[in-house]
UniProtKB/Swiss-Prot annotation:
<comment type="similarity">
    <text>Belongs to the UPF0304 family.</text>
</comment>
<dbReference type="InterPro" id="IPR023145">
    <property type="entry name" value="YfbU_helix-hairpin_sf"/>
</dbReference>
<dbReference type="InterPro" id="IPR023146">
    <property type="entry name" value="YfbU_alpha-helical_sf"/>
</dbReference>
<protein>
    <recommendedName>
        <fullName>UPF0304 protein MS2240</fullName>
    </recommendedName>
</protein>
<dbReference type="Pfam" id="PF03887">
    <property type="entry name" value="YfbU"/>
</dbReference>
<dbReference type="InterPro" id="IPR005587">
    <property type="entry name" value="UPF0304_YfbU"/>
</dbReference>
Length: 164
């Protein structure tokens, strides 16, 4: 991470203030302040990893995934016979916190800060799937988009999407 002396001073002061405002994490902020003030290149790379970039297309895919899960839930509720499918299978489980952090962060922004999709967000605390889900969700999206009536899915269509 390349920074001018002025930028480093501003960031170091911000870390100092964060340490004062958040005593529980003061040690973490003091470490970060020291790294920035010292200009330690190796550790500055660590800071750069905190700034994730998620493309517009990736954001759209996350939103489409949430919309697909909404459609699955609505369609399930409208089924006359639910005996071959449990509601548990329709639960969105989130993204892997280690390998899919940028998607998980965007998901948390959309559901937490923006307050969208709250009606069906029942994933485990933090929505950490603990296994990569991006490719699975993309396969599911392809199946869902191929359905003629995306919000009036049959039992077979729901199962095909879930099994993609």
């Amino acid at each position: 991470m390349e920074m001018t002396s002025t930028q480093r001073l501003i960031l170091a002061n911000q870390y100092k203030l964060m340490g004062l405002l958040d005593p529980a994490n003061a040690q973490k902020y003091a470490r970060l302040e020291t790294i920035v003030k010292g200009g330690f290149s190796l550790e500055l790379k660590e800071l750069d990893n905190e700034f994730l970039a998620i493309s517009e297309a990736e954001c759209q895919t996350v939103l489409e995934t949430l919309e697909m899960y909404h459609a699955l839930q609505v369609s399930y509720e409208n089924l006359a016979d639910k005996s071959d499918l449990t509601a548990h299978r329709l639960q969105f489980i989130g993204y892997d916190a280690i390998r899919e952090r940028k998607y998980l962060n965007y998901l948390r922004f959309i559901t937490g800060i923006e307050g969208k999709y709250q009606e069906f967000m029942r994933c485990a605390p933090g929505c950490d799937s603990q296994t990569p889900m991006w490719d699975k969700y993309n396969k599911m999206l392809d199946m869902w988009k191929a359905c003629p009536h995306q919000y009036h899915l049959s039992l077979v269509e729901i199962q095909n999407i879930l099994n993609a």
